[in-house]
Amino acid sequence: MSTEATPLRFLVVDDTEDIRDLMSRMVVRLGHLADQAADGVEAVEALTRHDYDIMLLDLTMPRMSGEDVVRWLRENPDRGVGLDVVIISAWAGEQRAVLQELGVTTVLPKPLRGQQLRDLIEEKKTRTPR
C-alpha cells in the first residue's frame, strides 16, 4: 500500500518462526521487501551478501544473540552503512544501556505493532530520501 517508488529492504531476525513470518508479512503488506534469518549467524551471513535499510532484530537467540550481531556490525562498519538496527524484544529493558553504548537507538517491545512499523518506515524515508 506504499506509494514509495523504491521499497525499503528489511532483514527480519528472530528465532521464532511465527514471529519472523508475522513481521515479514507486515513489512510486505506495507510495500517493502523482507528477508528472514533465524538467528544471529544467519543474520551475519545475510548482511555479508546484501545491503539492508532496516534490520528488525531479536536479542535472545541461539548460536549468536542480537547483541552479538550489533557488535559484529560495529567491527565491520562497511556492512552496516545506512542500516537502521531496531531491537524487537520483550526483554530489552535490562540491556538498554549496553545497546545504547553499541549505538542502538531504537528498542521496541514485542509484539511489534503495525503503527510502530509504519513510524519506522516514515522516519527512515524522511532521513534517507530515495
Where are these regions (language model features)?
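C-terminal output helix
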Residues: 112-121
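Hydrophobic/aromatic residues positioned on beta-strands within the core alpha/beta folds
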Residues: 86-88
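His-Asp phosphorelay/catalytic-motif detector in bacterial-type signaling
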Residues: 51-53, 78-84
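Acidic, metal-coordinating helix/loop segments flanking the phosphotransfer/catalytic sites
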Residues: 36-54
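Charged docking surfaces used in two-component/phosphorelay signaling
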Residues: 21-29
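Receiver (REC) domain active-site loop signature in two-component systems and cognate sites
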Residues: 61
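Active-site residues of response regulator receiver
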Residues: 58
